UniProtKB/Swiss-Prot annotation:
One of its GO terms (biological process) is ribosomal large subunit biogenesis. It comes from Homo sapiens. One of its GO terms (cellular component) is cytosolic large ribosomal subunit. This is Ribosomal protein uL24-like. PROSITE patterns: RIBOSOMAL_L24 (PS01108).
Length: 145
């Protein structure tokens, strides 16, 4: 059910917006979930992927246990290139295989001050969401009296 009249649910319009999206919007679209350990640590579910993050492929032909570093984030093609995810071309040269960020899990973040700020902001908003709509014990006790 559609609630907002200003947001379209037309498939062709959504595809058009996806494939014609500017770079700053593509950054948000190219987000990856965090591993269970990082999710526990930072209380954040996903982050936009960036070069030098360590990731593990969890879907597709290249899924497996090896963890590789992100070599390049190619926003134009909506793919990332990972250290050990390569294939051999017919002429013998090896090339990186593009993988969509939603098909990987971030196992180690490359942190700088801006990224730390983003993590803090996301964790704070999640904390507010958990508290929302819950009665405090003092209020319940007062109501029962």
């Amino acid at each position: 059910m559609k609630f907002n009249p200003f947001v379209t649910s037309d498939r062709s319009k959504n595809r058009k917006r996806h494939f014609n999206a500017p770079s700053h919007v593509r950054r948000k679209i190219m987000s990856s979930p965090l591993s269970k350990e990082l999710r526990q640590k930072y209380n954040v579910r996903s982050m936009p992927i960036r070069k030098d993050d360590e990731v593990q492929v969890v879907r597709g032909h290249y899924k497996g246990q090896q963890i590789g570093k992100v070599v390049q984030v190619y926003r134009k093609k909506y793919v990332i290139y990972i250290e050990r995810v390569q294939r051999e071309k017919a002429n013998g040269t090896t090339v990186h295989v593009g993988i969509h960020p939603s098909k990987v899990v971030i196992t180690r973040l490359k942190l700088d001050k801006d990224r730390k700020k983003i993590l803090e902001r996301k964790a704070k908003s999640r904390q507010v969401g958990k508290e929302k709509g819950k009665y405090k014990e003092e209020l319940i006790e007062k109501m029962q009296e």
